[in-house]
């Protein structure tokens, strides 16, 4: 049986088909005086739109060379979509006219809505309510529109980069219309084609997540590129990203807001908060989204994936005509996390047979300057090089010629010989420029002739793109974690350390036993019953960081030490926090021996919902900030990945004589802590276990605290 979320997801995607594949369009507010109207109308001819275009103007007459209807209702025939280009105060009337004409898809260029404050947000809510009441799909407001290059449907209000690169396979979705244009322009200069470019603006209705879901099913799109300022429907975006990963469609995303300045700018631009950047970074890792920080890396990474696709063997062979470029490429490959293996002896022998006497068979392979005199050296050396069993992808560095004259000369011949060598090698291969450079129309023709995958990226951007493509392929091979059933709802609301540890124990998490005492005599009796050294900790609902104010004493043994410890801990806390309510003192057995203190904390992100952080625990949590984050629920396998991401991961495998911890036991404990937090419901603000003591024999929660929303 299909879930409700799946049904809603399909309905949302189906609703976009009528918009993005519209065959007739009304230009509402069309006028010769508007640069937006002029550009929108011209784009239909520029991109070869074969449908019908209907200018709509109150004054009627002729606009853009066509008779203008005075209203949408006056068009007199069915229309698939409308572009609203009217002033903000006229949007409601224009929308009502569009509805009356039965138009069920709208693109709203007009600004002055949620991005300008509370009053604008109210206007946007009213617009959305009107759209939903009539079943209208609404893109915008405050957006430039979209171009469906694959089906030649341009409802876009600025001039796109021309000429259009045919066969584009990258769908670009941006909350910023201008940035969508910048991405499209840079891609066009690099000879990289798009299938779609979509500006979502304020996202009153259609948001990035819905467009991603549409593109996952779009046959023309092989890679999806995103520019995000915020996320308006995190659950749907997560679901769409999972679908994309399963379908083998990489998502490459820029998400701004890592800095406070960028977050403020984004809020001013879209009227939305950007959310916690650490959580978004975790979402990318978890769902296989490739995160980049600039337009160049978005275009080059998406362009590589669109051309080369999934590479199963992620070991790289580097080839150049320059030894210096080979060395530079090797450095950047290592920085990108890409393995450049040694060649097998048979490969070296085969290369010696074709290289000049002064050449050295190696990876990276310097084919030497001899290729300037005899370009066939590439065609003869690339096949034995590519036959090496250790290689999965070949990257050859050579600038693409720019002019017809160059292409007719030796530079063009070198590229043709590289293409022949690529084809004969039987390996996936890409040619990269040495420095970032555009691709001319003549260069594109040569690439088509030679069937070469190419990036004008330069060494650093190109190898970064390869590293990201390899990482995505590895993530995809691990697959999408199977959906876990939600944990059984807990009918308790633990408050304080003792109750929280007891609750965790009931959910299958091993936790240290603690006893609440209210006198030195009770502390001594409890310690004697435990039969060994103990820990004393203050119990107070008002104190979170007990050790900061002398609220924790370790390794107390004997009646005198325990009694004195009780008095000291109470006195210390009363002196530091006289206003704090004290419930008493907790007595717990002291855990000695080798082990690593971990931290496991569940938080509720306002955009993404419950997430869990894992890191080195104890006093190191805030000092080192070495944590990995995932959305809940998590599997033990996902927690193992999180542990391996920590900067201090070496400590988990034993350090300077200490034994390695049982990572699987620790991962199981963390996954159960996550499930335990989910079971407590939405009123839980956070659940922290610190420390979670991990040893060679298991993991045990030594301290825990649940924080609740008082209004929940």
Short names for language-model regions:
Residues 1-712:
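Catalytic-core regions of core metabolic enzymes
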């Amino acid at each position: 049986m299909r879930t409700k979320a799946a049904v809603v997801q399909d309905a949302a995607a189906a609703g976009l088909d009528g918009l993005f594949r519209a065959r007739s369009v009304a230009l509402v507010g069309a006028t010769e005086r508007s640069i937006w109207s002029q550009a929108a109308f011209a784009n239909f001819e520029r991109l070869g739109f074969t449908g019908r275009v209907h200018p709509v103007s109150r004054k009627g007459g002729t606009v853009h060379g066509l008779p203008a209807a005075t209203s949408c209702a006056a068009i007199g025939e069915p229309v698939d979509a409308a572009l609203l280009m009217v002033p903000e105060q006229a949007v409601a009337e224009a929308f009502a006219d569009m509805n009356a004409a039965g138009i069920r898809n709208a693109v709203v260029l007009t600004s002055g809505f949620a991005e300008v404050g509370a009053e604008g947000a109210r206007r946007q809510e009213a617009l959305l309510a009107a759209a939903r009441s009539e079943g209208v799909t609404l893109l915008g407001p405050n957006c430039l529109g979209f171009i469906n290059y694959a089906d030649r449907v341009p409802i876009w209000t600025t001039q796109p980069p021309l000429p259009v690169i045919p066969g584009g396979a990258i769908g670009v979705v941006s909350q910023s219309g201008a940035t969508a244009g910048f991405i499209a322009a840079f891609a066009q200069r690099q000879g990289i084609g798009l299938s779609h470019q979509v500006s979502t603006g304020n996202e009153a209705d259609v948001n990035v997540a819905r467009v991603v879901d549409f593109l996952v099913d779009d046959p023309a799109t092989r890679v999806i590129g995103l520019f995000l300022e915020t996320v308006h429907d995190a659950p749907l975006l997560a679901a769409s990203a999972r679908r994309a990963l399963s379908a083998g469609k990489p998502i490459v995303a820029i998400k701004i807001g890592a800095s406070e300045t960028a977050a403020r700018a984004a809020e001013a631009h879209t009227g939305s908060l950007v959310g916690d950047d650490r959580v978004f970074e975790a979402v990318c890792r978890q769902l296989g989204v490739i995160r980049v920080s600039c337009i160049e890396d978005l275009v080059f990474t998406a362009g590589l994936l669109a051309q080369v696709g999934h590479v199963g063997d992620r070991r790289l062979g580097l080839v150049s005509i320059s030894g210096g470029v080979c060395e530079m490429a090797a450095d950047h490959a290592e920085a990108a996390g890409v393995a450049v293996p040694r060649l097998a002896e048979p490969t070296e022998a085969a290369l010696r047979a074709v290289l000049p006497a002064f050449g050295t068979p190696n990876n990276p392979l310097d084919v030497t300057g001899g290729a300037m005199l005899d370009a066939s050296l590439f065609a003869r050396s690339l096949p034995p090089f590519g036959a090496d069993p250790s290689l999965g992808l070949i990257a050859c560095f050579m600038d693409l010629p720019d002019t017809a004259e160059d292409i007719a000369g030796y530079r063009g011949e070198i590229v043709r010989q590289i293409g022949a060598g690529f084809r004969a090698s039987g390996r996936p291969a890409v040619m990269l420029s040495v420095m970032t450079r555009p691709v001319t129309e003549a260069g594109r023709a040569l690439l088509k002739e030679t069937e070469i995958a190419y990036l004008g990226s330069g060494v650093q951007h190109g190898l970064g793109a390869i590293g990201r493509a390899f990482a995505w392929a590895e993530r995809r091979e691990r697959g999408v974690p199977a959906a876990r059933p939600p944990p059984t709802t807990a009918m308790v609301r633990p408050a304080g350390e003792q109750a929280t540890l007891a609750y965790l124990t009931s959910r299958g998490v091993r936790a240290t036993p603690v006893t609440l005492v209210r006198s030195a005599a009770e502390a001594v009796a409890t310690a004697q019953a435990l039969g060994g050294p103990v820990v004393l900790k203050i119990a107070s609902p008002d104190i979170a960081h007990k050790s900061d104010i002398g609220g924790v004493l370790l390794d107390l043994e004997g009646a005198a030490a325990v009694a004195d410890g009780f008095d000291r801990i109470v006195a210390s806390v009363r002196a530091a926090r006289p206003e704090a309510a004290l419930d008493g003192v907790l007595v717990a057995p002291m855990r000695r021996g080798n082990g690593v203190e971990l931290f496991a904390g569940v938080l509720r992100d306002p955009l993404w919902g419950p997430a869990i952080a894992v890191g080195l625990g104890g006093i190191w949590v805030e000092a080192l900030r070495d944590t990995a984050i995932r959305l809940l629920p998590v599997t033990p396998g996902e927690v193992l990945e999180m542990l391996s991401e920590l900067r201090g991961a070496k400590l988990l495998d034993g350090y300077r004589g200490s034994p390695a911890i049982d990572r699987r036991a620790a991962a199981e404990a963390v996954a159960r802590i996550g499930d335990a937090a989910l079971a407590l419901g939405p009123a839980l603000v956070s659940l922290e276990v610190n420390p979670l003591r991990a040893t060679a024999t298991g993991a045990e929660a030594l301290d825990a605290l649940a924080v609740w929303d008082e209004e929940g």
